[in-house]
Swiss-Prot record:
Protein name per the record: Probable protein phosphatase 2C 2
Positions annotated to bind Mn(2+) 1: 158-159
Keyword Nucleotide-binding annotated: no
SMART domains reported in the protein's UniProt record: PP2Cc
PPM-type phosphatase domain location: 122-376
Keywords for the protein's UniProt record, in alphabetical order: Hydrolase, Magnesium, Manganese, Metal-binding, Protein phosphatase
Length: 380
């Protein structure tokens, strides 16, 4: 098993407190996919939409039938290496679309439409729009995989240059990962399958007509007692281990030496403006889905972390950088942990998500913020 990076600050709340479940969570017999998307999925998935009068409920996407067999595909070939030169600054447009509620392109999102919340089998999520006209964050969740309540896959997606790429990733990335995974337990095969799922989603998005923008992604697959976390970009996964925060992902930004070296060796240019490192004077993240105009440098290959879930693993936080730019890993665990204690009736994980979002906003965040909390005691 690959190891994770521990953040060793002492938690405010005693790590010795037990967060074990007293009883299992009831689960629905069907797969459930949740996104903030505004359009239907392709077959074999159908969607149902809430009314426009219910802005706090995202679209519910339900898988009609679990896959009979999960198979492997082929790897993508390597990209070409371009000659390095300093280009002009590129502007990323922002698409004028609505947020979670189904509103017209011409409408200005209403104040009550700025937040979206959802609770499902073993997880809660809360998203709040920042100062942009359009909400660019998305999320997805598929639980009860193949009829097993202890198997699930989750994702949080942070779009830039409009919500199109994040919406596409929310609809397709987790399904693509599942389509690549064989039901076996071989760790190397699972890691390779997750990688191919990311690469396939990126390739499919770039084939769409008039695509623009991109999206950072973080996903968490839970299967057979294993936790498989992957990321491309600066969405982050943080695990509470007995009250201590462990970052299971590393942000992909051009300020990282290895990322900057990769970009420059491929002919790209990295510089800093107002203390922010950017690629080609434009983008501040170095991996993700989309970004066709920077594709030779913005790769979609994820970094992957696999570990065996044990009783000390209490809950997992997946969140966009709207949270992590203002709230540290340990702070997030300390704030969420009291709401994850006790019996199912006493737990309030959705309130924990809201508390984290509100803290980031109170510290000056102007970005979209999405926080998903996954209670691992239900899933191992």
């Amino acid at each position: 098993m690959s190891s994770s990076v521990a953040v060793c600050n002492s938690p405010v709340f005693s790590p010795s407190s037990s967060l074990f479940c007293n009883k299992p969570l009831n689960t629905s017999p069907a797969h459930e996919t949740l996104t903030l998307s505004l359009s239907h999925l392709n077959p074999p998935v159908s969607s149902t939409s809430p009314s426009a009068a219910s802005p706090t409920s995202p679209f519910c996407l339900r898988l009609l039938k679990p896959p009979a067999k999960l198979g492997f595909g082929s790897d993508s070939g390597p990209g070409s290496i371009l000659k390095r030169k300093r280009p002009t600054t590129l502007d990323i447009p922002v698409a004028p679309v609505g947020i979670a509620a189904p509103i017209s392109n011409a409408d200005t999102p209403r104040e009550e439409s700025r937040a979206v919340e959802r609770e499902g089998d073993g997880y809660s999520v809360y998203c709040k729009r920042g100062k942009r006209e359009a909400m660019e964050d998305r999320f997805s969740a598929i639980t009860n995989l193949q009829g097993d309540p202890k198997q699930a896959i989750f994702g949080v997606y942070d779009g830039h240059g409009g919500p199109t790429a994040a919406e596409f990733a929310a609809k397709n990335l987790c399904s693509n990962i599942l389509g690549e995974i064989v039901g076996g337990r071989n760790e190397s095969k699972i890691e390779e399958a997750v990688k191919r799922g990311y690469l396939a989603t990126d390739s499919e998005f770039l084939k769409e007509k008039n695509v623009k923008g991109g999206s950072c992604c973080v996903t968490a697959l839970i299967s057979d007692g294993n936790l498989v976390v992957a990321n491309a970009g600066d969405c982050r996964a943080v695990l509470s281990v007995g009250g201590f925060a462990e970052a299971l992902t590393s942000d992909h930004r051009p300020s990282r030496d290895d990322e900057r070296n990769r970009i420059e060796s491929s002919g790209g240019y990295v510089d800093t403006f107002n203390s922010v490192w950017r690629i080609q004077g434009s983008l501040a993240v170095s991996r993700g889905i989309g970004d066709a105009h920077l594709k030779q440098w913005i790769i979609s290959e994820p970094e992957i972390n696999i570990l065996r879930i044990n009783p000390q693993h209490e809950f997992l936080i997946l969140a966009s950088d709207g949270l992590w730019d203002k709230v540290s890993n340990q702070e997030a665990v300390d704030i969420a942990r009291p709401f994850c204690k006790g019996t199912d009736q006493k737990r309030k994980p959705l309130l924990a998500c809201k508390k984290l979002v509100d803290l980031s906003v109170s510290r000056g965040s102007l970005d979209d913020i999405s926080v998903m909390l996954i209670q691992l005691c239900h899933l191992f």
